[in-house]
Amino acid sequence: MFGTPSSSPSFGTPSSTPAFGTSSPAFGTPSATPAFGTPSNPSFSSGGFGSSLFSSPFSSQQPQQQQQQQQQQQPSSLFQQQPSSNFGFQSPFNNTAQQQQQTPFPNAQLTTQMAPVAPIPYSLADRDVQAIIEAYKEDPTNPKYAFQHLLFSVTEPQYRVKPAAVSDIMWAEAMSKLEGMDSTERERLWPQLVQGFKDLSQRLKLQDEVLVSDRDRIKTTQSNVKMLQRHLQASTFPSIERLRQKEQSLQRRMLRVMRIIEGLEGKGFRLPLTKGEAELSEKLTAITRQVKGPGAELSRRVQSLQTISRAQANSIAAGSSLYLPGSTKIDEQSLIDMQEVLQQETEAIGRLGNVLKRDMRDMEIMVAEDTEMALDS
């Protein structure tokens, strides 16, 4: 059977070779009896691996085919053990070929040594999964929670603190936004942490409640404004118009009374009709005295001064002195008093001008009233 020891020698081997399983010389080494099919020239029989390969096709083809089958069935590496031969023992041909495949140079020795690597506690996939778990872990103290944001809310001063789960970068961004607002907004608002959909839904619920209350207040205010507008149009404007008409009627009545009083005074009737009219007459008399002041006798004094000045002028022209009885020298104080009197008279004339203007306006009103009365009649 194939692979068992036989008494007959193998094909292509000399008859003097030892029995199967015993050590034999390496492949390609010179032998006393040349192999089958090799030339008798010793130069060819003692050649290297290439010469023996081409000189003995049968002996070299079988190990190559079987070696390829073994490589297909069980892949080997340069650092693994040496493959065995077809007969269960190590073949020197395979050993030599393997050494030639491992090292390009026969005398060189290839040594490799890997650097020590620290053991990885978690793989990259495990770390990614752990990061995703931490990002979705809803915990108030979890700084890596993905669903968190800082929103501005109206907060009392005693509750304005930094949340524990907020990073410094996020807090700095929120504070910079707060500093960019107006002073009134900075006093009212403060960053508030919102985590997850639960806090967001609660915040939306509160905002909806505030919006509803604000809308109710706006509706109430609008209804109050409409009510005030209706009251203004229905009550206030007519009241103002009635008061204006009443004022005009009172002015007409006052003008009529004044005309009656003037007519009675012209006829010599100066007696007051009522106590209030008597008091009013006294007040008017006092005001008239204050207006006239010391200039009541101004005209008489002016006439006396004119007479004295004419007499002095005539005496100077005649070259004789004229003594006027009662003539006195006018000192500076008298001139100052006269200037004051003239100034007061000027002011009194201005007041009289204003009185005349008012009288003219009253006359226009009276004329208009007479015209209306004539038209009514």
UniProtKB/Swiss-Prot annotation:
Keywords, comma-separated and alphabetical: mRNA transport, Nuclear pore complex, Nucleus, Protein transport, Repeat, Translocation, Transport
**Principal place of residence:** nucleus
Family matches, as InterPro entries: Nup54/Nup57/Nup44 (IPR024864), Nup54_alpha-helical_dom (IPR025712)
Stretches with biased composition (Low complexity): 1-18, 39-104
Q: Which PANTHER family match?
A: NUCLEOPORIN P54 (PTHR13000:SF0)
How does the record describe its quaternary structure?
Answer: Part of the nuclear pore complex (NPC). The NPC has an eight-fold symmetrical structure comprising a central transport channel and two rings, the cytoplasmic and nuclear rings, to which eight filaments are attached. The cytoplasmic filaments have loose ends, while the nuclear filaments are joined in a distal ring, forming a nuclear basket. NPCs are highly dynamic in configuration and composition, and can be devided in 3 subcomplexes, the NUP62 subcomplex, the NUP107-160 subcomplex and the NUP93 subcomplex, containing approximately 30 different nucleoporin proteins.
Protein name, entry field: Nuclear pore complex protein NUP54
- Species annotation: Arabidopsis thaliana
Q: What is the lineage of its organism?
A: Eukaryota, Viridiplantae, Streptophyta, Embryophyta, Tracheophyta
